[in-house]
Amino acid sequence: GSEMCIRDSVPLVCFTGQVPLPLIGNDAFQEVDIVGITRNITKYSVTVRDRKDLGKIIKMAFHIARTGKPGPVLIDLPKDIQTASGPAEYPDKVEIRGYRVNDTVHVGQLKRAYKMLKSAKKPLILAGGGINVARANENLRRFVEAENVPVVTTIMGKGAIPTTHPLYVGNCGMHGKYAANKAVSECDLLFSIGTRFNDRITGDLNEFAPKAKIVHIDVDTASISRNVVVDVPIVADANVALDKLNEWAEPKKTAEWQKQIKAWDEENPLGMRRDKGMTPQMIMEHINKNYKDAIYVTDVGQHQMWATQYLELDSNSQLLTSGGLGTMGFGLPAAIGAKIANPDKDVVLSLIHISEP
């Protein structure tokens, strides 16, 4: 769960039990160095060693989990800390040494990226899950419409812009649309926001976007040029960057480029056979017609790919899925959580088969 959350930028605070403080380090019965084990799959992990620090640590944990690139935090509670009594102190705010949330953008780098966008003949915006995490969807839509630039998404980025929007091409990558992948291959500028460029999107790195200059905007410094070496790296929250870009935005002439992308889509569209009885694609079509404004949740498997290919999303709907790790078993608990958090919304869950519940 923790590894999935760190890949998909899901805020999570885990509380684990530990042997009493005096026994730590003695190989006591059921002692596990859970902090050490999870250090590489959490943003922060800590053992509470003084009950008086508990409130401060919990405050820190939720702040770290939610800010920057969201992710998991682990708090390890020794048994004697759990059973200790005394007044609880929960501070209004905490200062965390060495932890800084970047709420700015390097305007010079952003201007450089924008100039490249203006001069490009075949520009393409690649929107990743970072758009949905930052809730920058409206900002992205405004920028896309102002610039008149086509958009492709990753699986985790689906819904970053309404799927029925005329400038939306589709998902790219291993399970993406032909037109979206062709556009990535032929574009001369790939303007990427909130994506890690993982292998399911890029395939062979030597063949990925071979004709394009690449701009990469991401809140996580470690993601920049990790998989794909980019021409203009920009460390910034998606909303912060898009706010500034929207101040500069003005329409581009991309009619011929859009016409070419449409031709590719007509050449190899997503199919839907209707001569063999009920198909999974027809089920997705039925969901689109009857469950608008819903939260769609999938488990992991081929049914997940059908959902990412055929579900229609707009500003009032959402897709929850395990993209970075492909965690089977994710669907049911995620759907339960989605319903608890949104009791007035329909939640549609797609499972591998009906035996999971």
Task: Annotate each PLM feature.
Residues 354-357:
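A short, hydrophobic C-terminal helix/tail in secreted or cell-surface proteins
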Residues 38, 245, 257-264, 307:
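Generic structural signal of hydrophobic/aromatic residues within well-ordered alpha-helices
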Residues 262-344:
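Active-site diphosphate/adenylate-binding microenvironment
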Residues 349:
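Short beta-strand-to-loop acidic/aromatic patch adjacent to the donor-nucleotide binding site
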Residues 90-107, 254-277:
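Long, charged amphipathic helices and adjacent flexible linkers at domain junctions
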Residues 1-249, 286, 295, 346:
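N-terminal alpha/beta PP-like core and its mobile active-site loop of ThDP/TPP-dependent enzymes
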